[in-house]
């Protein structure tokens, strides 16, 4: 992360999440540097909770607030369905046009896009490759809080191991 958050990162109190009726009510106090995993079966509201705290859907009731200097990097599991007629390199450059080719290729290389992989058409990538591209773009913003909704769903073992290593080294809140 480029900038550190305050000690308090996320506070929720009786936060009711859902679409028509509450799926769950969540109270938590997440501090800087903590890593929180949300576990549970399908339909219990894990993704709904994450979408609520990043402002994609409204809370049904209760409150939530972020602390000082929080910069969120959000990965939605739907990013594995991303489409683009551009190459991996050009798609990445669209978001970071000031990078040199070497800088862009180095960033992509950290997510296993090496050599001619950067010239693949995004539409031809597997779900796992699209996830890696999305994570590369997100992490390039240097967020100090990562909100990841099932990032390993479409990844092969090498992709999962690479992500695991990066998350272990990540200095922000997760």
Per-region residue spans from a language model:
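ABC ATP-binding cassette signature C-motif
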Residues: 4-174
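Conserved catalytic-core segments of large NTP-driven translation/proteostasis enzymes
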Residues: 1
């Amino acid at each position: 992360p480029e900038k550190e958050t305050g000690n308090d990162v996320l506070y929720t109190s009786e936060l009711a999440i859902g679409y028509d009726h509450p799926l769950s009510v969540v109270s938590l106090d997440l501090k800087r540097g903590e890593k929180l995993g949300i576990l549970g079966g399908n339909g219990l509201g894990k993704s709904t909770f994450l979408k609520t705290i990043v402002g994609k859907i409204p809370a049904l009731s209760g409150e939530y607030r972020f602390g000082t200097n929080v910069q969120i990097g959000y990965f939605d599991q739907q990013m594995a369905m991303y489409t683009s007629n551009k190459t991996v390199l050009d798609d990445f450059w669209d978001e970071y046009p000031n990078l040199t080719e070497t800088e862009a290729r180095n960033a992509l290389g950290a997510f296993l896009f090496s050599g001619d992989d950067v010239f693949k058409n995004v539409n031809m990538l597997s779900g796992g490759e699209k996830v890696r591209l999305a994570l590369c773009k997100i992490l390039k913003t240097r967020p100090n809080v990562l909100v990841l909704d099932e990032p390993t769903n479409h990844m092969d073992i090498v992709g999962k191991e690479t992500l695991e290593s990066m998350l272990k080294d990540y200095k922000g809140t997760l």
